[in-house]
């Protein structure tokens, strides 16, 4: 959750974590299938703009997310169900070179969710503020999906 430097792609980084009692097979579709995000998150709309191949939500898919009229687009760049999802933001954030990876790890009591990303700010001097915003947002996503998955696992 600290800045790594001042230049080049990925100069600012973050990492958040959450745990759920649900197995990875329950958590994976909630994160991997774009349309399911609005079930468990604060997003008002979620879905695919373009399907990936061979899996519609996999590599090459462009996902669109909206929260109260503000949207973002991201491309899936890594796909290893039910353990790893990587994506790059195409639009919607004031950043360049944004890359994030969500990793699901089986643990004795369920699943550990790790969300890590890196970016460069488009506007000089805004990196630390964006980093703080992204840490809070991604922690909320991780906590919300963990809590929702806990309920599905009951």
Specify the residue positions occupied by each region the protein language model found.
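A structural signal for short, well-ordered beta-strand segments
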Residues: 14-20, 102, 115-117
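A conserved amphipathic terminal alpha-helix motif
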Residues: 112, 118-154
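Short beta-edge strand/loop motif at the mouth of beta-sheet-based domains
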Residues: 15, 35-71, 82-84
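Short, ordered beta-strand-loop transition motifs
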Residues: 7-8, 51-59, 78-80, 105-108
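Hydrophobic ligand-binding cavity/cleft-lining segments
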Residues: 1-51
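Short, P/G- and charge-enriched loop/turn segments at secondary-structure junctions
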Residues: 2-5, 59-63, 89-90
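Hydrophobic-ligand binding "helix-grip"
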Residues: 38-39, 66-112, 118-120, 148-151
